[in-house]
Amino acid sequence: MAPRSFPENPYILLTPGPLSTSPTVKAVMMRDWCTWDRDYNAIVQDIRERLVALATAGAGYTSVLMQGSGTFAVEAALGTALPHDGKLLVISNGHYGDRMALIAGYLGMRSAKLDFGETGRPDPDRVRDTIESDPAITHVAVVHCETTTGMLNPVEEIGRAVKSLGRVFIVDAMSSFGGIPMDIATLGADFLISSANKCIQGVPGFGFVIARRSELEQCAGRSRSLSLDLFQQWKEMETKGGKWRFTSPTHVVRAFAQALNELDDEGGVACRNARYRENRRILTAGMRALGFECLLPEALQSPIITSFLTPGRPGFNFNSLYQELKSRGFVIYPGKVSEADTFRIGTIGHVFPEDMHRLVKAAKDAMHRFG
């Protein structure tokens, strides 16, 4: 089916993912694939190589794809990376850091959480002090872009502290990889986790882990799960030409390969980041002009998603704003912060500056309805 023959989506998704995708990403999903076919597995291998190339110019890294949402990939990485006598330190300043701590609890791991609060920037010195005070800690995990608020955490500084003390560093780059320039070697990350349906602008269905090969090779027999055994999945892909251990989301994989092509066509991560930053600049300028305030100071804010404080305006509520904007072609996100009444608007995906100008106009029209 040609892209132009698709019905137009009734709204643009201004969310942290799943997000709006291009017509051409959708179009390539109209073909069926056999999971055992060499042509299909060649696509998988190409994706794996391209992910590593996106992550670093350095040597010694590999990648593995894992069925399911991004959380499946996080659980696979945590559940496979930690030895049974290891201990995980989770650095948290939001829902997704808390989720990693929750996963550790479910898996019966020894773990500790260093909590900076939902609007607090993680302090690398406190991370260092915490590790030094507990020699049992073997692995440290942190979220790069905490979409609870939209904060971009100082992962490079944290990584320097972690690696200087000889610990394994795990980075949840779910909502940043492909949209924010980074080098996994510079970050010091031994495992970096992301998902198909975020900044690379594919569709939901699998996550992936980019790992230091020497670390992943040590993970045999560690997994607490059969289907989420990251080492065995990697070994299968390595030795059998891209084959997955269990049924893979074939259409999603093909869409992701197309999304990678479109990232290249856009000029790579730096150019995509520039578009996201311009999207956010237009959004925040327009929303501030309408009287909305951002939750975070600019110095802490990512270009991925922005949390706005709900105004104390008579008659205003999020659900009404949501419906007004949806009727005008935009879907936004409710807040996730417990410390304040907020809502969120994403600026990633197949979304462009002209879309943000239209959103601001729609928000202005919607606000008139509230008086």
Swiss-Prot record:
The modification N6-(pyridoxal phosphate)lysine is found at K198. Its EC number is 2.6.1.37. It catalyses: (2-aminoethyl)phosphonate + pyruvate = phosphonoacetaldehyde + L-alanine. Pfam families: Aminotran_5 (PF00266). One of its GO terms (molecular function) is 2-aminoethylphosphonate-pyruvate transaminase activity. Keywords: Aminotransferase, Pyridoxal phosphate, Pyruvate, Transferase. It comes from the Bacteria. InterPro entries: Aminotrans_V_dom, NH2EtPonate_pyrv_transaminase, PyrdxlP-dep_Trfase, PyrdxlP-dep_Trfase_major, PyrdxlP-dep_Trfase_small, SP_NH2Trfase/AEP_transaminase. Its cofactor is pyridoxal 5'-phosphate. GO terms for biological process: organic phosphonate catabolic process. Belongs to the class-V pyridoxal-phosphate-dependent aminotransferase family. PhnW subfamily. HAMAP family: PhnW_aminotrans_5. Involved in phosphonate degradation. Homodimer. This is 2-aminoethylphosphonate--pyruvate transaminase.
